[in-house]
Regions:
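Juxtamembrane intracellular "pre-TM" segments in multi-pass secondary transporters
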Residues: 1-5, 189-219
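Paired small-residue
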Residues: 89, 100-108
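Helix-loop-helix hairpin linking two adjacent transmembrane segments in secondary transporters
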Residues: 139-187
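Extracytoplasmic
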Residues: 11-45, 232-234
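Cytoplasmic helix-loop-helix junction between adjacent transmembrane helices
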Residues: 105-143
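Extracytoplasmic gate region of multi-pass secondary transporters
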Residues: 30-31, 214-234
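Residue-level signature of mid-helix packing/kink "hotspots" within the transmembrane helices
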Residues: 28, 56-64, 148-149
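Conserved MFS/SLC helix-loop-helix module at the cytosolic interface between two early adjacent transmembrane helices
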Residues: 61-97
Length: 234
């Protein structure tokens, strides 16, 4: 497919980057809010760990079917559907009155932002020139890192001025704004005939990946290295 004009490609990158920035901010924000949540809800270390893990549980639930959905429905439809869940999750977190409510809201947030990186990367393969792909992918990761940075001192300042509940209402509104921008800027996806696969075909594909000897060496690295890193960050 012919790459999109430069101006349109930049617009698409910016709206996707905005959504990914918010998603990583939401991911890491509980670490900054931990003292406040401990005081207000009488949480212990286990509860804080569950809040962080709840996000990743929701995130992980969608990853296997996500690739099939992206190929079949396209980045625009998939990310809009998921971000709608993130809006609900962030708003529900702001209204929480118990630990169970907080945890359920974090799971919804994890589900809701779980396509914020893979949907753009899928679209970039079709919409950007090949020589710009690596640059766009690396810039997306940089924007995600900035989102985690924004969850530290900036969030501490906002919480001291307005409180953590208004913060999550604002995050919910920002996700809704990202949805509007994506709806307006991102083109529709015309699936290629070969991209529509049945569930059984997708399952066989996952099986082939799992049986690959090289792949089976990778999960321990991800579990201990990346898992340890995000545990420290969240």
């Amino acid at each position: 497919m012919t790459p999109l004009p430069r101006r349109q490609a930049v617009s698409i990158f910016l709206v996707f980057a905005f959504a990914y920035f918010i998603s990583t901010l939401i991911r890491a924000v509980t670490a900054t809010l931990a003292p406040t949540l401990v005081t207000e809800f009488s949480l212990n270390a286990r509860d804080l760990g569950l809040l962080a893990g709840g996000y990743f549980f929701g995130f992980a639930l969608t990853q296997l079917p996500l690739g099939t959905w992206l190929d079949r429905f396209g980045p625009k439809r998939v990310i809009l559907g998921f971000l709608g869940i993130a809006v609900v999750g962030a708003f529900a977190f702001a209204q929480a009155s118990s630990f169970q409510w907080l945890l359920a809201s974090r799971v919804l947030c994890g589900v809701g932002v779980s396509a914020c990186l893979m949907a753009p990367l899928t679209g970039y393969r079709r919409w950007l020139a090949p020589e710009n792909l690596m640059r766009a992918n690396s810039w997306m990761l940089m924007v995600g890192a900035l989102g985690m940075v924004a969850s530290t001192l900036p969030v501490q300042w906002i919480v001291s001025v307005a409180g953590w509940r208004p913060l999550f209402i604002a995050l919910s509104a920002m996700v809704a704004l990202a949805m509007v921008l994506i709806y307006l800027q991102v083109p529709h996806w015309h699936a290629a005939p070969t991209s529509v696969s049945s569930q059984s075909t997708a399952s066989r594909g996952y099986g082939e990946v799992w049986r690959n000897p090289y792949f089976r060496k990778m999960p321990p690295l991800g579990f201990f290295n990346y898992g340890g890193m995000v545990a420290m960050q969240t």
